[in-house]
A protein has these predicted regions:
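Short, surface-exposed "cap/lid" segments of acyl-processing enzymes
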Residues: 1-38
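Active-site signature of alpha/beta-hydrolase-fold catalytic machinery across serine-
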Residues: 8, 92-96
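Residue-level detector of anion-binding/catalytic polar loops
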Residues: 19, 76, 184
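Alpha/beta-hydrolase active-site loop
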Residues: 38-73
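The alpha/beta-hydrolase serine catalytic core
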Residues: 51-58, 100-220, 224-227
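Short beta-strand immediately N-terminal to the catalytic nucleophile in serine-hydrolase-like folds
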Residues: 80-82, 108
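Gly/Ala-rich beta-loop-alpha elbow adjacent to hydrolase catalytic centers
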Residues: 82-86, 90
């Protein structure tokens, strides 16, 4: 829900004969609760979900569920499209799962989750402080302890989630992941996006995508993060 950015593209896709399913994932909203059941992911957070509690790697379960749904409905030529963090999840899913049911994909404005870049950015000291706080909570046996951070985005995070997204491992660095994507992929970026997390993509996105089979890059003039 609340996928207004997709309304106009969806209408054009429908007009071109492509069916569209607008969906969400476990990272929607800040915090919400789910019955735990037998889910390992829900047991980990005691049923709490949302952006404050999510682990990005779990996006594989969400993409698999929606792709399974589409296949069960009879679709065989499936494309997926994610925006912002959803774009990071799209690239990560394609790079790590290699699901042959997905014929093509679009990733719009994926922020770069690069630990060193966050330390070196203008607000690097704020990031360093939040990261130290998350590490302290984790070391104290409180991975679900909450912290309010302003870098790279103003939000509430559990220590586990903050370390997962922005840790030294750079697990979700979209630029690091791109060479592992085998699916034809279009990456887009708004020409008016000025956040430091998009600087390297704006600078080298065209070259990087040209080196990938089926890769393409589009810098949209005059577009902000929500196009």
């Amino acid at each position: 829900y609340d996928a207004r950015m997709y309304d106009k593209p969806a209408a054009r896709l429908l007009g071109a004969g492509c069916d569209v399913l607008k969906v969400n994932n476990r990272g929607h909203d800040l915090v919400y609760s789910q019955p735990v059941g037998s889910s390992p992911a829900l047991k980990l957070t005691r049923g709490r979900m949302g952006s404050a509690y999510e682990i990005v790697d779990d996006c594989g379960h969400d993409w698999n569920a929606w792709i399974d749904f589409a296949v069960a409905a009879g679709y065989r030529r499936i494309g997926i499209w994610g925006h912002s963090l959803g774009a990071v999840k799209t690239i990560y899913f394609l790079a790590t799962r290699h699901d042959e049911r997905v014929r093509c994909a679009i990733a719009s404005s994926p922020p770069r989750f690069c630990h060193r870049e966050l330390l070196d950015c203008e607000a690097g000291e704020s990031f360093r402080a939040s990261y130290a706080r998350a590490n302290a909570l984790q070391a104290a046996g409180e991975p679900d302890g909450l912290l309010s951070a302003t870098v790279p985005t103003f939000n509430l995070f559990t220590a586990r989630t903050y370390l997962d997204k922005y840790g030294e491992h750079d697990r979700y660095d979209c630029l690091r992941l791109l060479p592992d994507v085998k699916t034809p992929l279009l990456v887009t970026l708004g020409g008016d996006e000025r956040d430091a997390q998009y600087a390297e993509l704006a600078r080298s996105g065209g070259t990087r995508m040209q080196s990938l089979p089926g890769g393409a890059f589009a810098l949209i003039p005059g577009a902000n993060h929500f196009y």
